[in-house]
Amino acid sequence: MIKRISEKFTPKQYLLAFFFLVGMLFGVYLIVAWSSYSPLDNSWASSSYIPTTINKAGRFGAWFIDLFFVLFGHVGHIIPFLIFGISFYFWRRKGKVPFSFFRLSLWLLGFSIFLCGVCVLFTLLFSNTPYYLSGGVLGGSLVTAFFPMLDFVGLMLSGTLLALLGFVLCSGTSLIRSCIYFYDWLTMKNPTQTQEEETISTTPVQQELALQEEPSIQSINEGERVFVSEAPSATMDEEKSLINIENLIQIQGLESASQAKESTIPTVPLDDVNQVELGGYAVEPELALPSVSVAFVEDTALSSSEAEHEDSKPFTTQIPHTAGEPLVATEFAMPKVSLSPLDTSLSDNSEIAREDESDLARQFAAQEQQRREEMALRAKALNAEEALQTILAEPEIRQNSTADVSDSTTPHYKPYGESLIHPALQQKVTTQVKPTTPMPSLDLLEHRPSQAHRITQEEIIETSQRIEHQLRNFGVKATVKDVLVGPVVTRYELELQPGVKASKVSSIDTDLARALMFRSIRVAEVIPGKPYIGIETPNVNRQMVTLREVLDSDVFRQSNSLLSMALGKDISGKPVVVDLAKMPHLLVAGSTGSGKSVGVNTMILSLLFRVKPEEVKFIMIDPKVVELSIYDGIPHLLTEVVTDMKKAANALRWCVDEMERRYQLLSALRVRNIEGYNEKIEEYEAMNMPIPNPIWRPGDTMDTLPPALEKLSYIVVIVDEFADLMMVAGKQVEELIARLAQKARAIGIHLILATQRPSVDVITGLIKANIPSRIAFTVASKIDSRTILDQVGAEALLGRGDMLYSGAGSSDLVRVHGAFMSDDEVARVVDDWKARGKPNYIEGILDSGEDEATESNGANSDAGELDDLFDEVVEFVTSTGTTSTSYIQRKFRVGFNRAARIMDQLEEQGIVSAMQNGKREVLARRSSDF
């Protein structure tokens, strides 16, 4: 818990402190009046003929004390002390205890019930006279009213129950625990850790708060907020100083038996422990003989006298440990010695003990060596090679003067069952029954119960005051107005004084984090919808965000888009779901270990839980080989997972050609996007009027008639490490990605590019201009943050899935805590899809168009024939200077293979140059140019 370092109070807290100070003085005044009470004084219930007042507190004090005695009887003796004690307690808290009308009413109700119960018990248990009742008027009235119905026993039980109930409501703890703490205070003992936690969890003065699992917008709008106010009502000036804490709910009795974990007390050398502080007093610890364990190679100290006699060490040896067996500490049968600081026999005989131990060690080593030699001779006599190897493999006791022993380190391979391949290297072939459900179930993901980490209002208030105090030290005047607690971070929203710029706070973020003793903080200069700035600080206990929890949320279930992807939760704990179709492309960057690959897997699994293979197809490029190769074999793939970067460029080139083909279809059907195209296909299929392919030409396929058009599926291209792809074919890949990013949105091709090196040579300006949606995980510097987000902030993230998301068309950054899933969960989902069907790979995606054209052209070149369109293409190329194969394909309405073959013929005839960086040059000129 963060310690309070600021004594800055609000005006309301100063007013309350003043009231409590007045209550203390009034309590002292009543104690003086109680100590000098005399029944002869003129008071509330009696009159005297004596004109003077005997009571030291005067007539007013005598009147109050007599009133207490008449109303409450003997119970009135404790009321002055209660008034003083309660006022002193709250005054010592110095405004740490939040007040509210409900809490004040609860305390008054509990105290009233407690007084009623105690007065009833005093009336029943003690003697009463016609002039004085032991329980006062209150106790006598209650006994008289309920005695006919409950009798003596019933009134005793009822009075006891009322007293206990009132005590619990008023104090927030049980009477037994209070007695234990009172006894510990008398005996100067500190309460145990468990008792302290239980007190904290059940005391209404220090109400504990827990994070909500899934807070919704409706719940926040309905008033699910806890105001840290100290009075039933507040004026306009007081409301300005209130701190609103969102996403917190009050809990009581959070402690349970599951939180009590067994703890092991580590062995600590006695010479390192000089004094132990108990209850604020320094007490010398009792010396005890620690157990000597041979599980340690180092010698263990016998007592605290080792500081004076460093040469005195116990005899220890190392016992061979077999893998898989529990390590048991073995102790030799030695007489127990009770040591104390007054005993000096050990120090006097240290030399003798050391000689005895060395002799014992040499004797033990000699016997062990002799035993091993005898066993080796017997093994050789019996020609038992396995026994000999076992003996040689046993660890030997290393003495100070042992010779080097040369052991064979060559592994001995043995057959593993029916195979010579190690089980770890064998490919697991699992035969899984085809699931009956249309989509995978969320039961494939592990259900991890959310852990509600407690956080107190006191900690929130103290941290808020520390932030205000440290900002004041840096010359910034600000007031915390709102606090939003999330699963990973807490955002403190501050109102700056007029004339203070938000950039001034951003410039001191590092110094402010150091002053607040946080690992890092992030300053949000703009909070949409609020006139505040935000300071986001990490929580002490971080809550894990699971993928199942996000996929099972209403936000993800009610999303209508096929390409909805779950990212995680925002700082308020609400699930974050994005639509890839609206992005329409995504750029992901983050340093190594920041959670980038887990974030990409989260997006892929979100789609696999939502779409069918005929709706969405994947092209996965994995330079790391191990990140996306687990998805190899799912029916959503258009081709196998690409691990060769040279083939990856071919896959992107195929996407460009597919984009051009789809645009021709959209133009022929007079629609603007893939949604309109699929709707028109469904409309005519419902009327049994399939639409023939309008761009089909004889020779493109083996069909004699144009085939019917089918619905187009979305294509998601995922590149796990974009930097490796840029290193192999940078310029060519940049142009291909730029073309896809510019035009592929309407025809359903979307890109997800991830890299761990967000530098300008990888994320070029051409790529950034066409990919507006970005996600930044933890990066190394502010320069990298500006490269990916055009803003700073990603360098201050906490890692492990903590990210900043910038959507298309908005410069606002949303902090998201990424969802987590294990490798086993990913494997279960992949196996489920593999059991549903096999992938239908498209041949030629990874093949270079130039290679195919060369092979096809080889046969025609041998025959000495040129294409029929060769002369027309030559005229077109020399006049326009265009050397694009896809452009020739569209211009002359030929297939891709034929267009590539013509382009190769142009190269052989010397009309165009060879391919260089994805381009060709026109070498020939028209005759009119001469």
Curated annotation (Swiss-Prot):
PANTHER family: DNA TRANSLOCASE FTSK, SPORULATION PROTEIN RELATED. It is found in: Cell inner membrane. It is a multi-pass membrane protein. Homohexamer. Forms a ring that surrounds DNA. This is DNA translocase FtsK. The keyword Acetylation does not apply. Belongs to the FtsK/SpoIIIE/SftA family. Residues 170-930 are cytoplasmic. Its main location: membrane. ATP binds at residues 593-598. The chain crosses the membrane at residues 14-34, 68-88, 106-126, 128-148, 149-169. The lineage of its organism: Bacteria, Pseudomonadati, Pseudomonadota, Gammaproteobacteria, Pasteurellales. GO terms for biological process: cell division; chromosome segregation. Consists of an N-terminal domain, which is sufficient for the localization to the septal ring and is required for cell division, followed by a linker domain, and a C-terminal domain, which forms the translocation motor involved in chromosome segregation. The C-terminal domain can be further subdivided into alpha, beta and gamma subdomains. The alpha and beta subdomains multimerise to produce a hexameric ring, contain the nucleotide binding motif and form the DNA pump. Essential cell division protein that coordinates cell division and chromosome segregation. The N-terminus is involved in assembly of the cell-division machinery. The C-terminus functions as a DNA motor that moves dsDNA in an ATP-dependent manner towards the dif recombination site, which is located within the replication terminus region. Translocation stops specifically at Xer-dif sites, where FtsK interacts with the Xer recombinase, allowing activation of chromosome unlinking by recombination. FtsK orienting polar sequences (KOPS) guide the direction of DNA translocation. Keywords: ATP-binding, Cell cycle, Cell division, Cell inner membrane, Cell membrane, Chromosome partition, DNA-binding, Membrane, Nucleotide-binding, Transmembrane, Transmembrane helix. One of its GO terms (molecular function) is DNA binding. It comes from Pasteurella multocida (strain Pm70). The keyword Protease does not apply. Residues 573-786 form the FtsK domain. GO terms for cellular component: plasma membrane.
